[in-house]
Amino acid sequence: MGIRMGRRLLFTLFLGALFCNGVYAKFTRYSFPKDFIFGTGSAAYQYEGAYKEGGKGPSVWDNFTHIPGKILNNDNGDVANDFYHRYKEDVSLLKDMNMDAFRFSIAWTRILPNGSLSGGINKEGVAFYNSLINDVIAKGMIPFVTIFHWDTPLALESKYGGFLSEDIVKEYVDFAEVCFREFGDRVKYWTTFNEPFTYSAYGYGKGVFAPGRCSSYVSKSCGVGDSSREPYLVAHHIHLSHAAAVQLYRTKYQPTQKGQIGMVVVTHWFVPYDNSDADRGAVQRSLDFIYGWFMDPIVHGDYPGTMRGWLGNRLPEFTPEQSAMVKGSYDFIGVNYYTTYYAKSIPPPNSNELSYDLDNRANTTGFRNGKPIGPQEFTPIFFNYPPGLRELLLYTKRRYNNPTIYVTENGIDEGNNSTLPEALKDGHRIEFHSKHLQFVNHAIKNGVNVKGYFTWTFMDCFEWGDGYLDRFGLIYVDRKTLKRYRKESSYWIEDFLKRH
């Protein structure tokens, strides 16, 4: 008996024990609506590698990760998982796990090396994504494509500050149109931006993500930036870029291609630290400043009232024409969820040291009276709290007119400090996804229009500021050889998604 077959048999026995004990009994893909989509996700910079190959130009992340000290252990995505060369092997793994869909992003500078049409379209990049899309479809899966996952072209960052300038809107729409034109005959699910909150707040408020801008009183390492204004300006230009791309797609491509388009928004769920009115207010402000910042404009046409009232002229305004274009600019919403926090009201910040982080006047923590809200994960900012996902989905139904939702990221990590046999035994990940899926199921039964669930992530990969320390994948990747190994969770997913 081969090693692979032996491991598969052992895992089948392990699953059998769980089912006999009633732990996961009768809970499978058939517990969900027939058209529910199950998948897993990735991102170009975190996976592809080949950062100077195939005609690709540099992005802000290529630049940022090469600055010593910016990333843990000075890791980078130069090679990453070498998905650029190994994607056929990896798509076969997805098929083995019975996935319905694969979520991935298109690297802007692999299509437009200097970010602009004036620099020419890179035919090698187009060919790569055509081949990837075709292979995903040939394996019976749905490509779920993100147009922008934080990798702004370095040329545009150098030319006019990237998303700090409204000039980015036209450049982004040009890039999006190349994607629609080249791939839209086969891609039926588009998302314009992944987690614009993270890009804006971490790249321009904290300075810990590319392009690494912040006020000096936030961090001496940034060198340049304004944490009180730049996150809001960048987010505003993202809204305008998103809306313009959606408008283009709807008028020029959607009538014939018959696809759908939306935005992926990340948020936490929040619980009052105590039952006071002040802390309940802190919960709402916390939601407004991370979730409402992006949901309110695309659903209601403007930023939340708390943001508008408290930020004053630091928050850009939409013109009536822009508001009309932004409002309703989605066919579905992608929601990324990882954790829940307690929220406690705090006094207004020092007016001389304003920053996005303090503007919501709420302190968020995973602990109350020394006890965590849920088990603390390897990355200590995350707490495993499955009911939070259900509450978030119900809140979205109430506040945002029950939109079509895909849970586009949900996952748990472990550290890169275990032996291979230990790394493959990830029962905590099985429990994590099973419980979160049960709460998604509860939300559906309560009328929330959830249409899909994507794990984060397909394979262990480059995790931004933490480099390769955190492992979120269903597949273990040996960092020296890049060989892929299936974790126990991948076999659980395979069985969970098996069709009768």
Swiss-Prot record:
InterPro entries registered for this protein in UniProt: Glyco_hydro_1 (IPR001360), Glyco_hydro_1_N_CS (IPR033132), Glycoside_hydrolase_SF (IPR017853)
Top-rank EC class of the record's enzyme: hydrolase
Amino acids binding a beta-D-glucoside: 46, 149, 194-195, 338, 409, 456, 463-464, 472
GO biological process, one term: carbohydrate metabolic process
GO molecular function terms listed in the Swiss-Prot or TrEMBL record: beta-D-fucosidase activity; beta-galactosidase activity; beta-glucosidase activity
Disulfide bonds, paired cysteine numbers: 214-222
UniProt-annotated glycosylation sites, renumbered to this chain: 63, 114, 363, 416-417
Signal peptide range: 1-25
Positions of the catalytic residues: 195, 409
Superkingdom assignment: Eukaryota
E.C. code: 3.2.1.21
Keywords: Disulfide bond, Glycoprotein, Glycosidase, Hydrolase, Signal
Protein's UniProt keywords contain Flavoprotein: no
Reaction(s) catalysed by this chain's protein: Hydrolysis of terminal, non-reducing beta-D-glucosyl residues with release of beta-D-glucose
Keyword Disulfide bond attached: yes
Pfam families the UniProt entry points to: Glyco_hydro_1
Assigned protein family: Belongs to the glycosyl hydrolase 1 family.
Protein name, UniProt field: Beta-glucosidase 30
Native source organism of the sequence: Oryza sativa subsp. japonica (Rice)
